[in-house]
Curated annotation (Swiss-Prot):
Protein name: Elongation factor 4
A GO CC annotation given for this chain: plasma membrane
Residues that hold GTP according to the record: 14-19, 130-133
Family named by the database record: Belongs to the TRAFAC class translation factor GTPase superfamily. Classic translation factor GTPase family. LepA subfamily.
Primary enzyme class: hydrolase
UniProt keyword Nucleotide-binding, yes or no: yes
Chief location: membrane
Keywords, ordered alphabetically: Cell inner membrane, Cell membrane, GTP-binding, Hydrolase, Membrane, Nucleotide-binding, Protein biosynthesis
Record-level Gene Ontology MF annotations: GTP binding; GTPase activity; ribosome binding; translation elongation factor activity
GO biological process terms held by the UniProt record: positive regulation of translation
PANTHER family in UniProt: TRANSLATION FACTOR GUF1 HOMOLOG, CHLOROPLASTIC, TRANSLATION FACTOR GUF1-RELATED
Length: 595
């Protein structure tokens, strides 16, 4: 046990952690030439393409130093803000962390939030400046930022490059010398912390865990504390490039368990595994149920694909327990599901995986967050969908979720960023200077305003320099109204949104203008209206396409022409009564990107 080292890597998106992890694996001969591909640990195609790590992964390496053999377990973490709970569990399974900072970009917001998480868990931090081979690298300045943040010595910071392999040996030595061995009791009752699970179509759910106390053997009868379910450990082992079965996994080591579990809901990240015969007194602290933050309706384009969509979502849920869904129906779109996601990136990934892995074409409605609606009798109801709102006369008040956001930016962009946050109803909490020209600004913002286009706007205002991180803060009372879009007097439920009173008129107007551009002209006039309750606040009209019915008349009597025009008018009127308006998918998406 004293020769085991468990460590994770903390880095912002794109700071090169997956590439550096490749070098560590290569250096310790974990990966040989034929298996070597870029980003060995990112095994979903989507992860490789987007260059982000979505799932946490783990891999074990052997390393020999000064004649002693060591076992190093690298637990790779996702760097994106949507997956921060997965990061926190991975961090809890480690004793040390490599803090990787890009030599060209410096410290970013998510690096800081994950770093604080690591410091709270008492991890030993090894600071590394990565990508020093870049022509635009500024290692000295980045080292200054790290020293200011960690209060460490300049000599402790390792300069490395994942591309050239510089500094890899130093990093491995530092892991062995500085990261403490796991502190567990081999004789205590079994406690394993689950930090991830993957779905295998043949073997069911495979849970990855770290043994905190005790040890787990093949064939043990074990219990998962949070779900209170019992299983037999059909196979346990360690995670090399592939899974390697062992007869037992000892204290402090990282391994996997296969017990024929069929659904991911039974394996919760952060749960504790213990023996049924000799159970641990309590679970490992820090387990929480992951709650979705963003909700959207997902509908199949062809109505008969509804059951296929359900099957696809269930399969995705096997691999991604944070996805929730329940059936709902919409007048405009037919039957579909209300899905809950951790955030916007998570939503995009689910959409892409539906498309790639299951060939499902879906329409996604405007995303919204969950609101707490209090009625006049004092009852409270969580609403995930604007159409589930009570009648306005019955509502006492509505509370919406607020987040505490931290934005790290160059001082040159403070003005525009503050304007953006104020436009999103943000409240400035405080600002702190990290170094001479970098500042961290804290805002309280309503989550509903962030959901749509905040991140894109932030990036474009700051020319890509600002980084953004957030966590849920509290619920606050807000004056929210339900905005409906009517086409020829018929409400389109999929376009309904909850919006703040102050923004409602401009939002309604912009929505009508946007829909006017996107809905194709029909043979009859289409009135697009935005309404709050019975009050119409904006209107646009799409002119009909018409045939020139009088073209065949030459001169002659005016009454002949009048008769034809009247006849056409009658026809148009009849069409308008029975005609339906097709709303293209582009229109639903355009609502998200209202500028």
């Amino acid at each position: 046990m004293k020769n085991i080292r468990n460590f994770c890597i903390i880095a912002h998106i794109d700071h090169g952690k997956s590439t550096l992890a490749d070098r560590l694996l290569e250096y310790t001969n974990t990966v040989s030439g034929k298996d070597l591909q870029d980003q060995v640990l990112d095994n979903m195609d989507l992860e490789r393409e987007r260059g982000i790590t979505i799932k946490s992964h783990a891999i074990q390496m052997d390393y020999e130093m000064d004649g002693e053999k060591y076992v190093l377990n690298l637990i790779d973490t996702p760097g994106h803000v949507d997956f921060s709970y997965e990061v926190s569990r991975s961090i809890a399974a480690c004793e040390g962390a490599l803090l990787i900072v890009d030599a060209a970009q410096g410290i970013q917001a998510q690096t800081i939030s994950n770093l604080y998480m690591a410091i709270e868990n008492d991890l030993t931090i090894i600071p590394i400046v990565n990508k020093v081979d870049l022509p635009s690298a500024m290692p000295e300045e980045v080292e200054d930022q790290i020293i200011e943040l960690l209060g460490c010595d300049r000599s402790e910071i390792i300069r490395a490059s994942g591309k050239t392999g510089q500094g890899v040996d130093q990093i491995l030595r530092a892991i062995v010398e500085q990261v403490p061995a796991p502190a567990g009791d081999p004789d205590a009752p079994l406690q394993c912390l689950i930090f991830d699970s993957v779905f295998n179509p043949f073997r069911g759910i495979i849970a990855y865990f770290k043994v905190v106390n005790g040890s787990i053997r093949k064939g043990d009868h074990v219990k998962f504390i949070a779900t209170e379910k019992e299983y037999d450990a059909d196979e346990v082992g360690v995670l090399r490039l592939d899974m390697e079965p062992r007869s037992e996994v000892k204290t402090g080591d990282v391994g996997y368990i296969i017990s024929g579990i069929k659904t991911s809901r039974e394996v919760k990240v952060g749960d504790t595994i213990t023996h049924v015969a000799k159970p641990a007194k309590e679970a490992i602290a820090g387990f929480e149920e992951v709650k979705p933050m963003v909700f959207a309706g997902v509908y199949p384009i062809e109505a008969e694909d509804f059951e296929n969509l359900r099957a696809s979502l269930e399969k995705l849920q096997l691999n991604d327990a944070s996805l929730t869904f329940q059936p709902e129906s919409s007048v405009a779109l037919g039957f579909g599901f209300r899905c809950g996601f951790l955030g916007l990136l998570h939503m995009e990934i689910v959409q892409e995986r539906l498309d790639r892995e299951f060939n499902m074409n879906v329409i996604t409605t405007v995303p919204n967050v969950s609101y707490k609606v209090y009625d006049k009798k004092g009852g409270c109801k969580e609403v995930h969908n604007p159409s589930g709102l009570l009648e306005p006369t019955l509502i006492d008040h509505i509370e919406e979720p607020f987040i505490r956001a931290s934005v790290i930016t160059n001082t040159a962009y403070i003005g525009p960023i503050m304007t953006l946050c104020l436009g999103k109803r943000g409240v400035l909490v405080k600002q702190e200077y990290i170094s001479g020209d970098r500042v961290e600004i804290f805002y309280d913002l309503p989550l509903g305003e962030i959901v749509i286009d905040f991140y894109d706007k932030l990036k474009s205002i700051s020319k890509g320099y600002a980084s953004f991180d957030y966590h849920l803060h509290d619920f606050r009372e807000s004056k929210l109204v339900k905005l409906d879009i009517l086409l020829n007097g018929e409400p389109v439920d999929a376009l309904s949104t909850l919006t703040h009173v102050d923004n409602s008129v401009t939002f309604g107007r912009r929505m009508c203008e946007k829909l006017k551009e996107l809905i194709p002209r029909q043979q009859f006039e289409i009135a697009i209206q935005a309404a709050i309750g019975a009050k119409i606040i904006a209107r646009e009209t799409i002119k009909p396409v018409r045939k020139d019915v009088t073209a065949k008349c030459y001169g002659g009597d005016i009454s002949r022409k009048r008769k034809l025009l009247e006849k056409q008018k009658e026809g148009k009127k009849r069409m308008k009564q029975i005609g339906t308006v097709e709303v293209p998918q582009k229109a639903f998406l355009a609502v998200l990107k209202l500028d």
